[in-house]
UniProtKB/Swiss-Prot annotation:
Residues 167-187 are annotated as: Disordered. One of its GO terms (cellular component) is endoplasmic reticulum membrane. The modification Phosphoserine is found at residues 168, 170. It comes from Rattus norvegicus. Interacts with CYBB; CYBC1 may act as a chaperone stabilizing Cytochrome b-245 heterodimer. GO terms for biological process: innate immune response; respiratory burst after phagocytosis. It comes from the Eukaryota. This is Cytochrome b-245 chaperone 1. The gene is Cybc1. It is a single-pass membrane protein. Pfam families: Cybc1_Eros. Its main location: endoplasmic reticulum. It is found in: Endoplasmic reticulum membrane.
Length: 187
């Protein structure tokens, strides 16, 4: 799942994302490797601690972030929050929370973009496009697998923000060509 809807009202849309099963499995696998190396080695206690802490460090580094997106029409802002356990441990609890605040009126479009994920193939993410030409992803990492989950979140945001795409001139001409001719237009 890309993001879960925490709350949805006419003025507020709150989306959340937590590390997925793949991320937690990787954490358990790497950490158990360190524990097994420490348990089965004949090394001193210092080396055993090094094995465990080294693998814990690598495991936490590979853990995905917790992410939130809060769209609030009453304040006119969207708040994108990210919490990283790795940054929290690395900076000794001083950092780990990143936050981006943007005005809702600046959002022009919501798109789904494809991103290449090293070793695994393709991933998808929602990208917010702003009036300034700047774009920002809704989450920091792409989700693997079904594009439909990501498209559903993009449609939810688009409908909440009431962003309706205007037809381009070429789309208008194509739709008028496909319409049946009126009674006076037949030859």
């Amino acid at each position: 799942m890309y993001m879960q809807v925490e709350t949805r009202t006419s003025t507020r849309l709150h989306l959340k994302r937590a590390p997925g099963i793949r991320s937690w499995s990787l954490l358990v696998g790497i950490l158990s490797t360190g524990l097994a190396a420490a348990y089965y080695s004949g090394d001193s206690l210092g080396w055993k601690l090094f094995y465990v802490t080294g693998c814990l460090f690598v495991a936490v580094q590979n853990l995905e972030d917790w992410e939130e997106a809060i769209f609030n029409k009453s304040t006119g802002k969207v708040i994108l929050k990210t919490f990283s356990l790795y940054k929290k441990l690395l900076t000794l609890l001083r950092a780990g929370h990143d936050q981006v605040v943007v005005l809702l009126k600046d959002i022009q479009d919501v798109n789904v973009e494809e991103e290449k994920v090293r070793y695994f193939g393709k991933g998808y993410m929602v990208v917010l496009r702003f009036a300034t030409g700047f774009s920002h992803p809704l989450t920091q990492s792409a989700v693997m697998g079904r594009r439909s989950d990501v498209e559903a979140i993009a449609k939810l945001i688009t409908s909440f923000l009431e962003l309706h795409r205007l037809e381009s001139p070429s789309e208008r001409s194509q739709s008028s060509d496909s319409e049946p001719d009126g009674p006076g237009g037949q030859s």
